[in-house]
Swiss-Prot record:
Keywords: Acyltransferase, Antibiotic resistance, Transferase
TM region positions: none
N-acetyltransferase domain boundaries: 1-145
Name of the molecule in the record: Aminoglycoside N(6')-acetyltransferase type 1
GO molecular function ontology, one term from the record: aminoglycoside 6'-N-acetyltransferase activity
Organism: Salmonella typhimurium (strain LT2 / SGSC1412 / ATCC 700720)
Binding site for acetyl-CoA: I81, F82, V83, Q89, R90, G91, V92, A93, K94, N120
Superkingdom in the source lineage: Bacteria
Annotated binding of substrate, by residue: W22, H25, Y66, E79, D115, E136
Residues in coiled coil: none
Enzyme Commission identifier(s): 2.3.1.82
GO BP, sorted A to Z: response to antibiotic
């Protein structure tokens, strides 16, 4: 298995994996996200490849605003991670996280953060298994003006 930072040749593989994680996200929106990741210095995606097949990805960003539970800035933020079901429990996600962490460290980050919804217990377990610690639970509100 090989972990690579996404480049243009990986876009179709990445989009296929991403559609499995976020199936409600329109295809053209995935493409626009991919183009933005390729062009922006504060965004990156890493692809796990095995025998020429994309088996997982991790999207990340560098955030300079307040990140819940963090004490420093900037923070490398895990925006999303996905591994094909047949490749789970084999250390793929761990290697993807290590690549994201190295990228963030090279960008001056001392902390990595992520989030998930309170009802997504599978994601919570994955985060804990990958070394993340829960920092807080937040409910957001809005009021239209």
């Amino acid at each position: 298995m090989d972990i690579r930072q996404m480049n243009r040749t990986h876009l179709d593989h990445w989009r296929g994996l991403r559609k499995q994680l976020w199936p409600g996200h329109p295809d053209d929106a995935h493409l626009a996200d991919g183009e933005e990741i390729l062009q922006a210095d504060h965004l990156a995606s890493f692809i796990a490849m095995a025998d020429g097949v994309a088996i997982g990805f991790a999207d990340a960003s560098i955030r300079h605003d307040y990140v819940n539970g963090c004490d420093s800035s900037p923070v490398v933020f895990l925006e999303g991670i996905f591994v094909l079901p047949s490749f789970r429990q084999r250390g793929v996600a761990k290697q993807l996280i290590a690549a994201v962490q190295r990228w963030g460290t090279n960008k001056g980050c001392r902390e990595m953060a992520s989030d998930t919804s309170p009802e997504n217990t599978i994601s919570q377990k994955v985060h804990q298994a990958l070394g993340f610690e829960e920092t807080e639970r937040v409910i957001f509100y809005r009021k239209r003006c």
